[in-house]
Curated annotation (Swiss-Prot):
GO terms for biological process: nucleotide metabolic process. One of its GO terms (molecular function) is UTP diphosphatase activity. Keywords: Cytoplasm, Hydrolase, Nucleotide metabolism. The active site is at 79 (proton acceptor). This is dTTP/UTP pyrophosphatase. One of its GO terms (cellular component) is cytoplasm. Its cofactor is a divalent metal cation. Belongs to the Maf family. YhdE subfamily. SUPFAM superfamilies: ITPase-like (SSF52972). It holds the Pfam family Maf. Nucleoside triphosphate pyrophosphatase that hydrolyzes dTTP and UTP. May have a dual role in cell division arrest and in preventing the incorporation of modified nucleotides into cellular nucleic acids. It is found in: Cytoplasm. The keyword Membrane does not apply.
Amino acid sequence: MALKYKLILASGSPRRVDLLNQAGIEPSRLMPMDIDETPKKSEHPRSLARRLSAEKAEAALAAIKGDITWKGSYILSADTVVAVGRRILGKAEFADEALSSLHLLSGRNHLVYTGICLVTPDRKIRQKIVETKVRFKRLSGFEIENYLASGQWRGKAGAYGIQGLAGTFVQKMVGSYTNVVGLPLYETILLLTGEGFDVHSRWPEG
């Protein structure tokens, strides 16, 4: 029988948990890492996603150091960045920030980058960056006003979650949908299985 290694998800995102559950994976532990997500001067959005996903994984690894309960476990982290050109749209915490982001996204293409980072049981670090191109329709003031009132923009990169009401704003998308949600499922499973994590024996039997 294949060994069922433990998987630590260095995130508290319900969306990422749901996506892993969709693939039949139940993380053994959730470890949201509180790191400084401020972009460095002139940092490219792709580079930011790569750096932050690595920093989250490394912080989780440091947090379990010396704890034999988690010896030999996998650590998975992810960070999603939304950008118009090189302009990074952070996680909106206030309505005026969300309003600014929505005006910028309205009628334009933008890119969503998710960096995924996997720490293997022998402590190798593997990374992958996934990019999706998204185009919003031109938003009316009425749509923006009602979306802001919904509160669904809070804490979201680019002030929106595609799996919620803002999904109605998407005119066109090229690339992974799950990447925009927050965890590119195909690439994540590829990364896990490529490093010996047994995904498929965890699938339920009918």
